[in-house]
Amino acid sequence: MTVDPDSRLQLLLSERENALGAWLEANVQLSSALDHLRQLHATKAEALKARWISPHQLAQFRRWEKEMVKPTDYRTIASYTQHRHIIASIDRRWDGAITAAQVEVDRATNELAVATADLLSTMPVALASELTDLSVRLLSTIVRAVANTHSAPATRMVQRH
């Protein structure tokens, strides 16, 4: 039994087109998930800003919480207690949504990796090699960008699961 070369070529082109479509869709999904995550972080930052918590105060508070070292002078203790109440309230409100958005980014990143592998499997070896290098650089850039958007409590929450 012989295979018609034209039908084999059509099949390969169709597979490549389908893989490219899936890859493009995975890119759109990841971009959307990252935008949503950034938006949640920005909204949380705005909520803190609206309650007069500066980035410096938040960083100091996170250090105190992480190191389990509390301030010692009365004025700082009062400030810490007040900020702890405000920050904890905002954390409770936003960290669940941020964690869910991070899970969605992780899922979309995995789907992009699978779609990339599927697309590469439809290409000649030399082109696939070049695209693999590009995809690895792109995915590592995405991973670094996502890691930089994590807030301390959201990161701790994700690590517990």
Where would I find each of the regions flagged by the language model?
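The alpha-helix within a helix-turn-helix
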Residues: 129
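Short, charge-rich amphipathic alpha-helices with coiled-coil/heptad character
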Residues: 1-31, 35, 80-84, 88
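Short, basic interhelical loop/turn and adjoining N-cap
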Residues: 132-142
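Short Lys/Arg-enriched helix C-cap and helix-to-coil transition segments
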Residues: 150-161
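Extended alpha-helical coiled-coil "stalk/arm" regions
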Residues: 30-80
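Short, amphipathic alpha-helical "recognition" segments used to contact nucleic acids or chromatin
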Residues: 106-122
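Residues within the helices of the helix-turn-helix
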Residues: 126
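Residue-level detection of the helix-turn-helix DNA-binding "recognition helix"
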Residues: 144-147
